[in-house]
């Protein structure tokens, strides 16, 4: 596990606890990288997921762990809502077959909203759909 300045792993997968080789994670790692800007030149080309402070790595580790265990009770306890038959997306992408259809529905909805107003394109970090709720 090689790190640069004790802050960013050369291989982002060293910062990931579960399902390290998932294609969604690889896509995110390839898309969101450090670039030369003067302050962080030493990290140029490395994935943001490799940062020890990466909220996206934290998000992946938590939500993917819950999904793999099929146990969203920590989320249910936090938001006081029962999540029956939960399906999850991270960064609007399905990381398993259960959530594939949800990815297309959410993507279509976002395309109808984004681009019609100034500002950054929407990319929710976490979307969870159950039989009765969309979070």
Model regions and ranges:
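Charged, terminal alpha-helix-loop-beta segments
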Residues: 1-135
